[in-house]
């Protein structure tokens, strides 16, 4: 095993093998424990894209809320699923299928296009130009603004979908989809997340669909693997301590080092990870 590989595995808490049912219970208990400790909270809010990660996080969250209602008799415990399209979403059917699978208690829809376009126009008012990539990050951050607005109105906390295969590459928008209160998938790689969905009875297309951030107008539905230059199979193998090609390992490690700032709170004078 490569030296940095061992360090990364430890830092992200990845196990080489898992029992999916045990990990489902671990995540559900984690979500419930946070509510029991923070009794002012009554809802969890999650943006739903129709991909594997939000499908799994949503299913785990709904299960936690069902158990909280059963255990406490308090029907105020609710899971709020939020659709956050930029105008019309090409894979809207996938998102609605995910919501149907997880049986969300409440479903809301917020079209972020007017807000995103207004922000782009405001920044460009001085003659500068927002790149398509930068605009994609604005979309991700606007989605999180909407989720926190909904959470604030409903005594809620925001659920994130970050997992080990995403964390190792930093493949998320800082203070966008990377900003949340709780991340129940953290420690799981991509194939492990799919294994949890299988035991939860998810339709296969929810975990077989090619992962995409789908943030760029000029490159819609760009597959994650194309953007990263490495396949999730190799990322998962790497995180599980298996051998991968030097090229795959070097690509993963390059992303890990380049995106270290995303895995830290705002940098202070006491931090030295970046030096």
UniProtKB/Swiss-Prot annotation:
This is NH(3)-dependent NAD(+) synthetase. GO terms for molecular function: ATP binding; glutaminase activity; metal ion binding; NAD+ synthase (glutamine-hydrolyzing) activity; NAD+ synthase activity. Belongs to the NAD synthetase family. Pathway: Cofactor biosynthesis; NAD(+) biosynthesis; NAD(+) from deamido-NAD(+) (ammonia route): step 1/1. Gene3D superfamilies: HUPs (3.40.50.620). SUPFAM superfamilies: Adenine nucleotide alpha hydrolases-like. Catalyzes the ATP-dependent amidation of deamido-NAD to form NAD. Uses ammonia as a nitrogen source. Deamido-NAD(+) binds at residues 141, 174, 181, 261-262. Mg(2+) binds at residues 53, 166. Homodimer. It comes from the Bacteria. One of its GO terms (cellular component) is cytoplasm. Its EC number is 6.3.1.5. HAMAP family: NadE_ammonia_dep. InterPro entries: NAD/GMP_synthase, NAD_synthase, NH(3)-dep_NAD(+)_synth, Rossmann-like_a/b/a_fold. It catalyses: deamido-NAD(+) + NH4(+) + ATP = AMP + diphosphate + NAD(+) + H(+). GO terms for biological process: NAD biosynthetic process. Pfam families: NAD_synthase (PF02540). ATP binds at residues 47-54, 161, 190, 212. Keywords: ATP-binding, Ligase, Magnesium, Metal-binding, NAD, Nucleotide-binding. The lineage of its organism: Bacteria, Bacillati, Bacillota, Bacilli, Lactobacillales.
């Amino acid at each position: 095993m490569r030296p940095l590989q061992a360090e990364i595995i430890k830092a992200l808490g990845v196990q080489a093998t898992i029992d999916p049912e045990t990990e489902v219970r671990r995540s559900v208990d984690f979500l419930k424990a946070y509510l029991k400790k923070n009794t002012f909270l009554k809802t969890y809010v999650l943006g739903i894209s129709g991909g594997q990660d939000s499908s799994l996080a949503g299913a785990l969250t709904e299960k936690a809320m069902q158990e909280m209602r059963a255990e406490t008799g308090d029907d105020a415990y609710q899971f709020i699923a939020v659709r956050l399209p930029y105008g019309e979403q090409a894979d809207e059917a996938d998102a609605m299928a995910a919501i149907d699978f997880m049986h969300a208690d409440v479903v809301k829809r917020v079209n972020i296009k007017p807000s995103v376009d207004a922000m782009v126009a405001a920044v460009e008012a001085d003659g500068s130009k927002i790149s398509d990539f930068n605009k994609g990050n604005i979309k991700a951050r606007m989605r999180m603004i909407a989720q926190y607005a909904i959470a604030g109105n409903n005594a809620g906390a925001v659920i994130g979908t970050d997992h080990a295969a995403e964390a190792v590459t930093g493949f998320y928008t800082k203070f966008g989809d990377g900003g949340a209160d709780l991340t129940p998938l953290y420690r799981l790689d991509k194939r492990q997340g799919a294994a949890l969905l299988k035991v939860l009875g998810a339709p296969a297309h929810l975990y077989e669909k090619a992962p995409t951030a789908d943030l760029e107008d000029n490159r819609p539905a760009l597959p994650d693997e194309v953007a990263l230059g490495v396949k999730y199979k190799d990322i998962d193998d790497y995180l599980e301590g298996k051998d991968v090609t030097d090229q795959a390992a070097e690509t993963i490690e390059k992303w890990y080092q380049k995106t270290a700032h995303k895995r830290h709170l705002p940098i202070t004078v006491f931090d030295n990870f970046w030096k």
